[in-house]
Amino acid sequence: METGNLPDNTLILDSLIHSVLVINQEFIICYANHAALQVLAQSRRKLFETPFTDLFSYHSFDAELMQETLANGQSFTDNEVILVIHNQSHTMSLSAQPISEQHILLELAPMDSQRRLSQEQIQQAQQIAARELVRGLAHEIKNPLGGLRGAAQLLAKSLPDPALTEYTQVIIEQADRLRTLVDRLLGPQHPGKKTHQSIHHVVERVAQLISLECPENVTLLKDYDPSLPELSHYPDQIEQVLLNITRNALQAVEKTGGTIILRTRTAFQITLHGERHRLVARIDVIDTGSGIPPHLQDTLFYPMVSGREDGNGLGLSIARNLVDQHAGKIEFTSWPGNTEFSIYLPIK
């Protein structure tokens, strides 16, 4: 059967929308199609003979496992990798397979938007379920705590030896400490007064509070968009959200020194809770700390999840809950030297 004059292989590869690269056994790039040049923001001349892993300031895939798998003649696939290119984070799928004894074919494809949305919905449902479970447990703990404290007070009054009240006082103090923890688990019960004003009032107040806590080796920068429209929000709640996140950022940089950035921007065509918004407000909290460990990133907003030994894991869970009450969302990206939390709030 006649096949006609087929186009050159490179023309076929350049017509693909996904990034395709050919590397050798040492991971040195031998070829990159047009889509790869665009994603990597490099020319073919610069890419040629460059190690593949050197293209990224950070990558989440296991390069050693990938090299070992390919050396055994097997294909390697990671459906969700984070690649940081020119300080921009990209979530992609990575597949690699040997095409000869000397060469390996790599394909990079951006995560499908529908798949990303589905994952976000699953994670949100899991977080809501975990939050409701914790709230239920908190209520069950709170009820007997009141009885325990009251009994300790009555016992203190009836003790014949005043010296023994030292022990009942310990019971009362520990009951109060547990009640405070339970109240934090339940989150704020009174949202305060809702206002329609610039979000910069809240952001600036948080900046002032955090600046008082910053040691000399930490720089706090502010980058506000003056054209950001006013929006309806509960200032006390948004202040709590920003304080929780910014204090985490401060703890990430205060020992070694670094920078925290508070930034506001207008974002366009963003989906919040299943509704497409033409215009939303975005508040970013960025720090130059060591980053969030990969094993914590999928469950970071769950109650009681913390990357610090002395952390209680409630700050981000409460922040997520408060942003949800505003019909908004929180996203983050993190790698060593850069962690960015973005809060999206609808402008109506």
Curated annotation (Swiss-Prot):
Chain segments annotated as transmembrane: none
Tell me how the protein is altered or processed after translation: Autophosphorylated.
What is the annotated localization of this protein? Cytoplasm
* CDD domains per UniProt: HATPase_Glnl-NtrB-like, HisKA, PAS
E.C. number: 2.7.13.3, 3.1.3.-
Q: Which GO terms describe its molecular function?
A: ATP binding; hydrolase activity; phosphorelay sensor kinase activity
| Reaction catalyzed | ATP + protein L-histidine = ADP + protein N-phospho-L-histidine
Sites bearing Phosphohistidine, chain numbering: 139
Q: PAS domain: which residues?
A: 5-78
Report the domain of life of the source organism. Bacteria
User: Per the record, what is one GO cellular component?
Assistant: cytoplasm
From what organism does this protein derive? Proteus hauseri
Q: Which gene encodes it?
A: ntrB
Residues holding ATP? 329
- Main function: Member of the two-component regulatory system NtrB/NtrC, which controls expression of the nitrogen-regulated (ntr) genes in response to nitrogen limitation. Under conditions of nitrogen limitation, NtrB autophosphorylates and transfers the phosphoryl group to NtrC. In the presence of nitrogen, acts as a phosphatase that dephosphorylates and inactivates NtrC.
The entry's keywords = ATP-binding, Cytoplasm, Hydrolase, Kinase, Nitrogen fixation, Nucleotide-binding, Phosphoprotein, Transferase, Two-component regulatory system
Put simply, this protein is called Sensory histidine kinase/phosphatase NtrB
Q: Name one GO biological process term.
A: regulation of DNA-templated transcription
* PROSITE patterns registered for this protein in UniProt: HIS_KIN (PS50109)
Q: Which residues form the Histidine kinase domain?
A: 136-348
Q: Name one Pfam family in it.
A: HisKA
